[in-house]
Amino acid sequence: MDIIIIPKKNAIKKYIIWGTHFGSIDNHFIMPNTGEEVYIPDGVAHFLEHKMFEQPDGTNSLDTLMALGIDANAYTTNDHTAYLFECTDNFYEGLDELIDYVQHPYFTEENVEKEKGIIGQEIGMYDDDPGWQLYMNAMDCMYKENPIKIDIAGTVESISKITPDVLYKCYNTFYNPANMTMVVCGDFEPEKLLEEIKKRLIKKENQGEIKRIYAKEEKEINQKEKEVSMELSNPLFLIGYKD
């Protein structure tokens, strides 16, 4: 795993981000350990990010970090997922929690089903967001096969197919240290910080390269234009260029 430490002498805040190269476009791949070819529903990377905070004892790691006075968050993009926090105090307590929850996923039939309702509501909110709809429709006009045209959160239909087994399969494939990067910035002694990070990491075998499979995309656009009616005070438009 790549660990990048950026010392900032006398900096008040400390910042850490831990990311994995697993995003919404990674929906077809070959597992490196088994050679199994896997297709997953749209929205799994985002769904997995949401579920990482829940603990077996019923607590939530975001709440735990907030109780320490730490500003924590996570996000998913087309090509990666990241977990992060910033703080002025309690950095090492926050580091304990971050490394613990990212290394110990907890997925059950019950908590996965519950999350489907929560993410379904989130998808509905984005369906009503003019700016997001503008962007997604532009992607749909430009691309025919590339999964970048699909919403990062997936659809209500696609997330209904997500199971604990799917989540664990993706976690075990993409959350391997060989596929992850950590960046830390603040007033640290790099050698000491690196030692503290390594003490907390679970040693895993390097599983080898993950073979991602992407559909062949033609140079031609999918459609020239698309118009959608929504309640707005001013019209919105977006011009896309397919490279």
Residue ranges and their predicted role:
Residues I5-P7, Q55, S61-I210, D243:
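Charge-rich, well-structured scaffold segments of protease-associated domains
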